[in-house]
Amino acid sequence: MESVALYSFQATESDELAFNKGDTLKILNMEDDQNWYKAELRGAEGFVPKNYIRVKPHPWYSGRISRQLAEETLMKRNHLGAFLIRESESSPGEFSVSVNYGDQVQHFKVLREASGKYFLWEEKFNSLNELVDFYRTTTIAKRRQIFLCDEQPLIKPSRACFAQAQFDFSAQDPSQLSLRRGDIVEVVEREDPHWWRGRAGGRLGFFPRSYVQPVHL
């Protein structure tokens, strides 16, 4: 994921990352702290205050969901090349690309070289965004012609759908989305009557339907 710095930030601790307004940062981890993200800029890594940056949203980024949930999600989409990028369950800051091969889901670990560039095979990229764009027009598979292709969820509102949290909800699983009472959530999937999927505060995950009330903005 990429983000744009809204303001300049001077690091005051050794584990923080300084940046200037307008810099493009790579977000490595969004899950561990509600106020700070781990990011990279010009080969240096550190924590940055999330209110100083704006994350560039992408429908293909699913955060820290499990391999099993990724497979279930993609197999429900009867669409060759449907894909998502998820954070590694075992190695924070690392990513995997999960792709619908038609009869199964294949997973590719995104590798990184010392300079910080991402790659799957020979080609190197400065960001996950560049990697995704490349494999939209170049096959990601070696033995088959499979291109990354966006697809809308099976059930998608005709216009943006939002809900407001009526209660606090603490995620019990990495695939879930923690909420505070009053939070506004953009609902992106309502396939399950008990668990909806939505986006809030730059994070994407599942939350109980009974904890929210639809609203019109």
Swiss-Prot record:
PROSITE patterns documented for this protein: SH2, SH3
Description of how the protein assembles with itself and partners: Associates through its SH2 domain with ligand-activated receptors for stem cell factor (KIT) and erythropoietin (EPOR). Also forms a stable complex with the Bcr-Abl oncoprotein. GRAP is associated with the Ras guanine nucleotide exchange factor SOS1, primarily through its N-terminal SH3 domain. Interacts with phosphorylated LAT upon TCR activation. Interacts with SHB.
Residue ranges annotated for the SH2 domain, each copy included: 60-152
Coiled-coil residue windows: none
PANTHER family associated with the record: PROTEIN ENHANCER OF SEVENLESS 2B
Pfam families per record: SH2, SH3_1
Gene Ontology annotations for the cellular component aspect, listed alphabetically: membrane; presynapse
Location(s), subcellular: Membrane; Synapse
Protein name, as recorded: GRB2-related adapter protein
Entry keyword set: Membrane, Repeat, SH2 domain, SH3 domain, Synapse
Functional summary from the UniProt entry: Couples signals from receptor and cytoplasmic tyrosine kinases to the Ras signaling pathway. Plays a role in the inner ear and in hearing.
Main location: membrane
Keyword Cell division: no
High-level lineage: Eukaryota, Metazoa, Chordata, Craniata, Vertebrata
Membrane topology designation: Peripheral membrane protein
All copies of domain SH3, residue ranges: 1-58, 158-217
Species of provenance: Mus musculus
GO biological process: sensory perception of sound
Tissues where the protein occurs: Expressed in inner ear, in neruonal fibers innervating cochlear and utricular auditory hair cells (at protein level).
Homology family: Belongs to the GRB2/sem-5/DRK family.
